[in-house]
Design a protein with these regions (language model features):
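Transition segments tied to proteolytic processing and entry into folded domains
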Residues: 19-280
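Repetitive helical segments and hydrophobic/amphipathic motifs
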Residues: 11-13
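Bacterial N-terminal signal peptides that target proteins for export
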Residues: 1-6
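N-terminal signal peptide c-region/cleavage motif recognized by signal peptidases
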Residues: 15-17
Length: 280
């Protein structure tokens, strides 16, 4: 494959062939919903690609590569476009950083190996894309592709759950009966759309909590389903403990109730499991 200058690199020269060990790619069976949502929820381009050629860049051409990684220029054919307004050419090029093996040797990328990539477009270069992170390429599987399609479909909807930026305020109000209460948490979002969490306690009933997207709180609503975009926004963003400023105006009794109900929400959401550290 002929090496050309890419928008991600400066003055690429002819790169050496990709020899050494086969790629030690992360097993797709271990990738979680959060892993794929980290990469794909906001990516303008999501595609299933098949490698036509790979060239390894030397240290002079890849000065920003993390220790223990090697940068490659990939030429690939587009097998399927999952997201990408305006489409893509049949063949594209991009740069990717891949981990070296335990002996420090660069990986080998097999011709016709298949991947899922999450990327942005390169201005004025129709056949080039830039990965959203230097390693935003994962081995293809039908299960991972289906999960990504679901993430993209939800993220592209007009009613998509917004990105959460913090917790604005919280309050708890006791009911008329002993043990009865209602606690609400008002979340801050990137696009200023309201999200609120409500926890209801009633004597003799199981504690219930729900999430509302909008101004109207529906007591009959429930918590988000796991492995959905709304679940991801909450489980992978909300802090494990309430920030002190959220409780600054609460009485000691209210603070105790609010903290207990916040634990109900966090326990209900469960852990945001990741196998890779999100890179921004």
């Amino acid at each position: 494959m002929k090496t050309q200058i890419l928008a991600l690199s400066v003055a690429l020269a002819t790169a050496g062939p990709a020899m050494a060990q086969p790629v030690n790619q992360q097993d797709l069976q271990t990738l979680t919903y959060a892993d794929l949502a980290d990469l794909g929820a906001g990516a303008p381009v999501v595609a299933h690609v098949r490698v036509r050629g790979a060239e390894r860049l030397n240290a002079r051409e890849a000065t920003t590569v993390r220790p223990g990684f090697t940068r490659f220029e990939i030429e690939a054919e587009v097998a399927a476009l999952i997201r990408g307004t305006g489409g893509l050419p049949e063949r594209i090029r991009y740069l990717v950083d891949l981990p070296n093996d335990s002996r420090g040797r660069p990986p080998r990328i097999a011709r016709r190996s298949e991947y899922l990539i999450m990327a942005t477009r390169v201005p004025s270069r129709a056949d080039e894309v830039r990965l959203v992170t230097a390693d935003a390429q994962v081995a293809y599987s039908a299960a991972a592709a289906d999960m990504l399609r679901g993430i993209v479909r939800e993220a592209s909807g007009a009613d998509a759950a917004p990105r959460i930026t913090g917790i604005g305020r919280a309050f708890s109000v006791p009911g008329n009966l002993p043990g009865e209460s209602e606690t609400q948490f008002f979340l801050q979002t990137a696009d200023q759309r309201p999200i609120s969490l409500t926890v209801l306690r009633r004597p003799g009933e199981q504690v219930r909590w729900s999430v509302a997207l909008g101004e109207i709180v529906d007591d009959s609503a429930g918590p988000p389903q796991p492995n959905t975009l709304l679940w991801y926004r909450l489980a992978c963003t909300l802090p494990a403990r309430l920030p002190a400023d959220v409780l600054s105006e609460a009485t000691p009794e209210e603070t105790q109730a609010i903290q207990a109900d916040y634990r109900v929400v966090m326990d209900g959401l469960g852990r945001c499991a990741r196998t890779r550290a999100p890179r921004r």
